Amino acid sequence: MATNNQTTRKEIEAVYNCIAQDFSNTRTKYNIWHSVRKFIEELPSESLVADIGCGNGKNMQLRCDELEYIGMDISDEMVTICQTRGFNVVQGDILQIPFDDEYVDACMSIAVIHHLTTRAERISAIRELIRITKPGGKLIIYVWAFEQPESSKRKFTSHDEMVPFTNKDGTTYYRYYHLYTDGELLGEVMEACPDLTIIESLTEMGNYVIVAETV
């Protein structure tokens, strides 16, 4: 029998399958967040980079001639979009990433773990990201923040919300988001692995960002 948390992840998978094409059309390499771009640009050439929750693969377009990417997404439709574009992407769950221990040189999780409903799940997901990354490897985690800049279209009234996405045909779908408070992501990361070296902990355009080095 599926637990409530498993059901929620299945719901997220189903929603992204429904919105995949229209969602993908709103995500291009030209709207990659600054911290993500900086993270990718600073990686050594020939690094093997995992993008966990890669969506349409927009981040994997950067330095794709110098880096080797492997992506994973929960949505079959997103995986198909990525594969059509020539990216090496598999379907999977962030709580059970289908990669070996210490497999990649760097790992990205961009706007993913805020879809998990409990702190325990989010910490487990962070441990999975660390597990697949080699010692001395780099890790970036990016999540939505509760407090948003005045210029943002995002406005939240609680720390757990169902956020709408409307397809071109007018159908609206809702995705669960946990909206982080200041210091919350850092706390989860340090609970997941107290020995992790934190390189940066910052706020960017209504998001919290952690960049770390694994041990």
Model-flagged regions — what are they?
Residues 108:
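A conserved beta-strand element that flanks and buttresses the S-adenosyl-L-methionine
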Residues 105, 122:
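Functionally critical, cavity-lining and gating residues within the transmembrane helices
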Residues 111-115:
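Short catalytic micro-motifs in class I SAM-dependent methyltransferases
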Residues 1-50, 55-96, 120, 138-215:
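Class I (Rossmann-like) S-adenosyl-L-methionine-dependent methyltransferase catalytic domain
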Residues 123-135:
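A short glycine-rich, Lys/Arg-flanked "PGG" loop and its adjoining helix->strand segment in the class I
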